[in-house]
Amino acid sequence: MARKVIALAFLLLLTISLSKSNAARVIKYNGGGSGGGGGGGGGGGGGGNGSGSGSGYGYGYGKAGGQSGGGQGSGGGGGGGGGGGNGSGSGSGYGYGYGQGNGGAQGQGSGGGGGGGGGGGGGGSGQGSGSGYGYGYGKGGGGGGGGGGGGGGGGGGSGYVGKHE
């Protein structure tokens, strides 16, 4: 008799435990974070110079069958000068994403940094730079990917792309 009672109690506990785990499986959570920062610098008249910079960071997390976990960051800056002035700008961005679950969950991160430099009138020059970094991670049947970044310059200046992974 005691064995039957113990067996029934064990069976009941097993049933409760399985129902809880199934309930947890159907929970869907989509998490995404984004961070953006931008800085701008104004120029000056005559022989004035202007510069600006910006940066951003983003983080996202998705769990238990959720389809999205992604973070993205972006930053940009610009400056300009009138007359014989110079302008420069730079930006950077970082993104991180993490996805965990069984329903094709995926994590993706993208960091796009755009730096724009405004030029100057007359003999002025413009310069811009940007960098971006992306990281993605997927667990439990999902995959992750990472994005990149870019930069540009204007006003007769130059631009380049920094870190791009």
Curated annotation (Swiss-Prot):
<keyword id="KW-0732">Signal</keyword>
<keyword id="KW-0961">Cell wall biogenesis/degradation</keyword>
<dbReference type="InterPro" id="IPR040417">
    <property type="entry name" value="GRP1/2"/>
</dbReference>
<feature type="signal peptide">
    <location>
        <begin position="1"/>
        <end position="23"/>
    </location>
</feature>
<comment type="function">
    <text>Responsible for plasticity of the cell wall.</text>
</comment>
<dbReference type="GO" id="GO:0071555">
    <property type="term" value="P:cell wall organization"/>
</dbReference>
<dbReference type="GO" id="GO:0005576">
    <property type="term" value="C:extracellular region"/>
</dbReference>
<feature type="repeat" description="R2; Tyr-rich">
    <location>
        <begin position="132"/>
        <end position="138"/>
    </location>
</feature>
<protein>
    <recommendedName>
        <fullName>Putative glycine-rich cell wall structural protein 1</fullName>
    </recommendedName>
</protein>
<feature type="repeat" description="R2; Tyr-rich">
    <location>
        <begin position="56"/>
        <end position="62"/>
    </location>
</feature>
<feature type="repeat" description="R2; Tyr-rich">
    <location>
        <begin position="93"/>
        <end position="99"/>
    </location>
</feature>
<feature type="region of interest" description="Disordered">
    <location>
        <begin position="105"/>
        <end position="125"/>
    </location>
</feature>
<keyword id="KW-0677">Repeat</keyword>
<feature type="region of interest" description="Disordered">
    <location>
        <begin position="146"/>
        <end position="165"/>
    </location>
</feature>
<keyword id="KW-0964">Secreted</keyword>
<keyword id="KW-0134">Cell wall</keyword>
